[in-house]
Curated annotation (Swiss-Prot):
Cofactor list: Mg(2+)
GO term, biological process aspect, one: dUMP biosynthetic process
Protein name per Swiss-Prot or TrEMBL: Deoxyuridine 5'-triphosphate nucleotidohydrolase
Matches recorded under InterPro entries: dUTPase (IPR008181), dUTPase-like (IPR029054), dUTPase-like_sf (IPR036157), dUTPase_trimeric (IPR033704)
GO molecular function: dUTP diphosphatase activity; magnesium ion binding
Length: 144
């Protein structure tokens, strides 16, 4: 699939790290480093603008290494970029650790997954069909 992209950063386009990767690493595009204090959040620019085909979205997800090693994650995970959005792709990061974290220019801060989606059409009914699970949720099926 081809996706139109404008790269206003000085960094490479988002790229797959391996042949079978689902997500492309996306980089911070900063004029100076950002220091994220514990529990602080910020909007990080990437310098990337995309035009997705109709029926697709881009999901912005955390990078597992940053999450486990540094406590840095995408706050609205997954963030959704709609096919009709034409602004700069920016990433909302939060520092969940107890230590400050410095985001450097060019650092891989998140991953982007391109996915198909459908738009639902609501069908109002009076009663939903029965299932084995029923209304059970929030830990209903076992521990955790």
């Amino acid at each position: 699939m081809n996706v139109q992209v404008i790269n206003k950063s000085k960094h490479p386009l988002p790229a797959y790290a391996t042949e079978l990767s689902a997500g492309m690493d996306i980089r911070a595009n900063l004029s100076e480093p950002i220091t994220l204090a514990p529990l602080q959040r910020c909007l990080v620019p990437t310098g990337i603008y995309i035009a997705l085909p109709q029926g697709f979205e881009a999901q912005v997800r955390p990078r597992s290494g940053l999450a486990i090693k540094k406590g840095i994650t995408v706050l609205n995970s997954p963030g959704t970029i709609d096919a009709d959005y034409r602004g700069e792709v920016c990433i909302i990061l939060v520092n969940l650790s107890s230590e400050p974290f410095v985001i450097e220019d060019g650092e891989r801060i998140a991953q982007m997954v391109i996915a198909r989606h459908e738009q639902a059409v609501w069908q109002e009914v009076e009663v939903l069909d029965e299932t084995e699970r029923g209304a059970g949720g929030f830990g209903h099926t076992g521990r955790g």
